[in-house]
A protein has these predicted regions:
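Rossmann-like NAD(P) dinucleotide-binding subdomain of oxidoreductase/dehydrogenase enzymes
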Residues: 1-83
Length: 83
């Protein structure tokens, strides 16, 4: 999972998402509350590029609820957090 900050959201998300996808991992990403549109656009580009559904996933929600789900879900093996 990735949790990105409000400053430089696209650049910081790309640094986390691209390597994970390149080695065959799925990704769940949560943008900052202030800048969700930048990652929505990025994930639309991934879908347009042919990334299959369920491989790159975007979650928009309350910080605490999403963070708790990341930390508690057994399928999440790594978390990259900036901020």
């Amino acid at each position: 999972g990735t949790i990105t900050p409000w400053n430089f959201p696209s650049a910081l998300a790309s640094r986390k998402i691209a390597p994970a996808l390149a080695v065959g991992c799925t990704v769940v990403s949560r943008p900052a509350d202030q800048t969700p549109l930048s990652l929505i656009g990025q994930f639309e580009c991934l879908a347009d590029a042919g990334v299959p559904p369920g491989v790159a996933n975007l979650v928009i929600g309350k910080s605490r609820a999403v963070a708790d789900a990341f930390f508690e879900h057994p399928a999440v093996r790594k978390i990259s957090f900036t901020g």
